[in-house]
């Protein structure tokens, strides 16, 4: 990752947005493959990738169990995710002939669709209430598709966009960086894994054994950053069951590996070929750089993923403004 590609934290200059800001309901803007150029030149893309890289830097070399600041906004976001988790318990899967895509997910999703703005309003202070409808759209986009009952990296990106928007309106601040990943995103992953297991959700746009993972990407990026300069855990260790079982509570990357091995059968090299290849990379910093490049190429620059991304006033489609 070239230093020049780093963006400043999106919250650095916009901790308190102007009261005159016109919030809008985000909508799709990428309708055809040629529109992808608009996305890559957009303020939204610059702010989104800047946010991902800022957090990547923030968690470098730190364990999940590291002692970090937890603000009231972080606690409220965790409570929001706890609510989504509770709704899963209240919405058990239904008996149906098809093994995958349990229709009870639609009941769960309908509740979120109805309550999303109320949930976001518990996190956003009243003087920023005008931002709630815009920000809530990203939360609704972050948990899968209720028609197809699937989940993939586009939904994960919507959750990162949701957090990025909360930074841009000043709800989350620069010193929340570690907690955004270790507390909020980690809890989000737990809830998404529970959704995937409970309702047997299909992977959206999965590349099968040639993809990195059926459902997630960001925890591999941030998780590899956590492991940079680790005194003894090297990339080759993540395919070692003992190393994973002993260290997964400290490292997001190893939690992802544990989940894959719980969900899939057979040799690791066969069901997760891409990850198996990554285990041969000599250092975590090289893994981290490679995953950032791969994320851009396989997720952010792929029309089937980005066609669903929504743009509003906080993540706008207009070209990057300098300064």
Swiss-Prot record:
<comment type="similarity">
    <text>Belongs to the PTPA-type PPIase family.</text>
</comment>
<dbReference type="GO" id="GO:0003755">
    <property type="term" value="F:peptidyl-prolyl cis-trans isomerase activity"/>
</dbReference>
<keyword id="KW-0547">Nucleotide-binding</keyword>
<feature type="binding site">
    <location>
        <position position="214"/>
    </location>
    <ligand>
        <name>Mg(2+)</name>
    </ligand>
</feature>
<dbReference type="GO" id="GO:0042803">
    <property type="term" value="F:protein homodimerization activity"/>
</dbReference>
<dbReference type="GO" id="GO:0005737">
    <property type="term" value="C:cytoplasm"/>
</dbReference>
<keyword id="KW-0067">ATP-binding</keyword>
<dbReference type="InterPro" id="IPR037218">
    <property type="entry name" value="PTPA_sf"/>
</dbReference>
<comment type="subunit">
    <text>Associates with PP2A heterodimeric core enzyme PP2A(D), composed of a 36 kDa catalytic subunit (subunit C) and a 65 kDa constant regulatory subunit (PR65 or subunit A). Interacts with the catalytic subunit PPP2CA (via C-terminus). Interacts with PPP2CB.</text>
</comment>
<dbReference type="GO" id="GO:0008160">
    <property type="term" value="F:protein tyrosine phosphatase activator activity"/>
</dbReference>
<dbReference type="GO" id="GO:0005102">
    <property type="term" value="F:signaling receptor binding"/>
</dbReference>
<dbReference type="InterPro" id="IPR004327">
    <property type="entry name" value="Phstyr_phstse_ac"/>
</dbReference>
<dbReference type="GO" id="GO:0004721">
    <property type="term" value="F:phosphoprotein phosphatase activity"/>
</dbReference>
<dbReference type="InterPro" id="IPR043170">
    <property type="entry name" value="PTPA_C_lid"/>
</dbReference>
<feature type="region of interest" description="Disordered">
    <location>
        <begin position="1"/>
        <end position="22"/>
    </location>
</feature>
<keyword id="KW-0413">Isomerase</keyword>
<keyword id="KW-0460">Magnesium</keyword>
<dbReference type="GO" id="GO:0046872">
    <property type="term" value="F:metal ion binding"/>
</dbReference>
<dbReference type="GO" id="GO:0051721">
    <property type="term" value="F:protein phosphatase 2A binding"/>
</dbReference>
<dbReference type="GO" id="GO:1904949">
    <property type="term" value="C:ATPase complex"/>
</dbReference>
<feature type="binding site">
    <location>
        <position position="307"/>
    </location>
    <ligand>
        <name>ATP</name>
    </ligand>
</feature>
<keyword id="KW-0007">Acetylation</keyword>
<comment type="function">
    <text>PPIases accelerate the folding of proteins. It catalyzes the cis-trans isomerization of proline imidic peptide bonds in oligopeptides. Acts as a regulatory subunit for serine/threonine-protein phosphatase 2A (PP2A). Modulates PP2A activity or substrate specificity, probably by inducing a conformational change in the catalytic subunit, a proposed direct target of the PPIase. Can reactivate inactive phosphatase PP2A-phosphatase methylesterase complexes (PP2A(i)) in presence of ATP and Mg(2+).</text>
</comment>
<feature type="binding site">
    <location>
        <position position="148"/>
    </location>
    <ligand>
        <name>ATP</name>
    </ligand>
</feature>
<keyword id="KW-0697">Rotamase</keyword>
<feature type="binding site">
    <location>
        <position position="304"/>
    </location>
    <ligand>
        <name>ATP</name>
    </ligand>
</feature>
<keyword id="KW-0963">Cytoplasm</keyword>
<protein>
    <recommendedName>
        <fullName>Serine/threonine-protein phosphatase 2A activator</fullName>
        <ecNumber>5.2.1.8</ecNumber>
    </recommendedName>
</protein>
<dbReference type="GO" id="GO:0005524">
    <property type="term" value="F:ATP binding"/>
</dbReference>
<dbReference type="Pfam" id="PF03095">
    <property type="entry name" value="PTPA"/>
</dbReference>
<dbReference type="GO" id="GO:0005654">
    <property type="term" value="C:nucleoplasm"/>
</dbReference>
<keyword id="KW-0539">Nucleus</keyword>
<feature type="binding site">
    <location>
        <position position="208"/>
    </location>
    <ligand>
        <name>Mg(2+)</name>
    </ligand>
</feature>
<dbReference type="GO" id="GO:0000159">
    <property type="term" value="C:protein phosphatase type 2A complex"/>
</dbReference>
<feature type="binding site">
    <location>
        <position position="308"/>
    </location>
    <ligand>
        <name>ATP</name>
    </ligand>
</feature>
<dbReference type="GO" id="GO:0019888">
    <property type="term" value="F:protein phosphatase regulator activity"/>
</dbReference>
<dbReference type="GO" id="GO:0034704">
    <property type="term" value="C:calcium channel complex"/>
</dbReference>
<feature type="binding site">
    <location>
        <position position="153"/>
    </location>
    <ligand>
        <name>ATP</name>
    </ligand>
</feature>
<dbReference type="GO" id="GO:0043065">
    <property type="term" value="P:positive regulation of apoptotic process"/>
</dbReference>
<feature type="modified residue" description="N-acetylalanine">
    <location>
        <position position="2"/>
    </location>
</feature>
<feature type="binding site">
    <location>
        <position position="154"/>
    </location>
    <ligand>
        <name>ATP</name>
    </ligand>
</feature>
<keyword id="KW-0479">Metal-binding</keyword>
